[in-house]
């Protein structure tokens, strides 16, 4: 029975969270302070946690838009630039065969960001434009994932993530500052993005060793931190028309 239980436990960890040599090091030899293997376990665990959490990260934002039937306070340009950055990460990671645990959340965030882009257009009375956007985006994504796309183009797209993230977040920050409130921006989504990007700095260094990936997450953390700070600063601020209704 003990052997069966050990086998099941090993099956849960190897190779999802640990390579076999690290499993032996930690759970057979009981060398629980083996730093390299502990780093792998922490990185894989964090990575899979981030991927699982990403399924829900932007849903509060989607539901807030649907509930309010308004995209007030959201910068479409900012959301679009975030989509460019996420798409670059997905394509670059697939092309380089990085472990799914090191980038999987980008795929789920991409799908949710596409939905937000469409909803922003829809609630601005541009539904046809939104449908056209969905079709165009699907074609561009298929083209980028095609073997015909040169690696240099994919690398350039990933390198463009840094300016895309910076400009996109600054546009949203400027919109918040100009409005004096954060409108329909979801605080839950903002804080989850901030926490996820911080954790990704460690996991990207540990799992991919790619300085470009790590650099993108460092910049993303700084920019997400700025938006999170604005959410806290404008926590009790409301749009002028809402203030009038309350009066």
From Swiss-Prot:
Question: What topology does the record note for this protein and the membrane?
Answer: Multi-pass membrane protein
Is Repeat a UniProt keyword of this protein? yes
Question: Where N-acetylalanine occurs along the chain?
Answer: 2
Task: Cite the PQ-loop domain residue spans from the record.
Answer: 39-105, 159-216
Entry's transmembrane regions? 37-57, 74-94, 100-120, 128-145, 151-171, 185-205, 213-233
GO cellular component entries: membrane
Q: Name one Pfam family in it.
A: PQ-loop
Keyword Acetylation on entry = yes
| Cellular localization per UniProt | Membrane
The alphabetized UniProt keywords are:
Acetylation, Membrane, Repeat, Transmembrane, Transmembrane helix, Transport
InterPro entries from the xrefs?
Answer: MannP-dilichol_defect-1, PQ-loop_rpt
Family, according to the entry, reads as follows: Belongs to the MPDU1 (TC 2.A.43.3) family.
Described by its record, this protein's role is as follows: Required for normal utilization of mannose-dolichol phosphate (Dol-P-Man) in the synthesis of N-linked and O-linked oligosaccharides and GPI anchors.
Q: What is this protein identified as?
A: Mannose-P-dolichol utilization defect 1 protein
């Amino acid at each position: 029975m003990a052997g069966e239980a050990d086998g099941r436990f090993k099956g849960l960890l190897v190779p999802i969270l640990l390579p076999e040599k690290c499993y032996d090091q930690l759970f057979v030899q009981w060398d629980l302070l083996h730093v390299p293997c502990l780093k792998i376990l922490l990185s894989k665990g964090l990575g899979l946690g981030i991927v699982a959490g990403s399924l829900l990260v932007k849903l509060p934002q989607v539901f807030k838009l649907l509930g309010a039937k308004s995209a007030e306070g959201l910068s479409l340009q900012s959301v679009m630039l975030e989509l460019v950055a996420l798409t670059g990460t997905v394509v670059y990671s697939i092309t380089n065969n990085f472990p799914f645990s090191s980038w999987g959340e980008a795929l789920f965030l991409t799908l949710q960001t596409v939905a937000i882009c469409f909803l922003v257009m829809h609630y601005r009375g541009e539904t046809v434009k939104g449908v056209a956007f969905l079709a165009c985006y699907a074609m561009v994504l298929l083209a980028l994932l095609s073997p015909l796309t040169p690696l240099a183009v994919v690398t350039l797209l990933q390198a463009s993530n840094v300016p895309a993230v910076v400009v996109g977040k600054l546009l949203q920050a400027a919109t918040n500052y100009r409005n004096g409130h954060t409108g329909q921006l979801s605080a839950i989504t903002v804080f989850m993005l901030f926490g996820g990007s911080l954790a990704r700095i460690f996991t990207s260094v540990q799992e991919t060793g790619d300085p470009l990936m790590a650099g993108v997450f460092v910049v993303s953390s700084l920019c997400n931190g700025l938006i999170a700070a604005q959410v806290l600063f404008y926590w009790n601020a409301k749009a002028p028309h809402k203030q009038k209704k309350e009066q």
